[in-house]
Amino acid sequence: MTKETSKKIAITEMCGGKKISIQMYGPHSLNEDGTIMPFEEQMAIVSHYLHNQGFKYAKPYESKAEGLIEDIYNIQSKRVEEDCVSDTSAQYSLFSDLFSVPFLTTDNPKFTFIDLFAGIGGFRMAMQNLGGKCVFSSEWDKQAQKTYLLNYGEVPFGDITKESTKSFIPDDFDV
């Protein structure tokens, strides 16, 4: 990769703490019904996938997330077309900001949990302190989502009453 294409892509720079409206368009940014998936939902899928890689809990996110990562990479490196041998987003240094947060989860969890109505992550912090790993989070408030992203490196999914959101909840978790 050239210096231009190896530039880091940071979700927190795209949506953290700023009052901006972003929408990414690519072949993978469409819902099953053909509507465009909101940017926040795209980042929820990507961040949950990256934080659950290597665990079975990444499965619900895997296909869509890998497509979205490809779209984002292609959009960000549009000026320079370069063949890459790298396999994962980590090897591209994409989204490294998701792992530079104050409250990362343990690599060897004792149990798994989901964080519904997450707020800024108080329940998650308590569960992580007990050795748990969060495999899904949702929060409808936009400001709380931004704080959650900066604290945990994950964009919580939005409205839990939507079927599209429910489809990403892993089947097998402990709490």
Language-model segment annotations:
Residues 2-175:
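Conserved active-site and SAM-binding loop architecture
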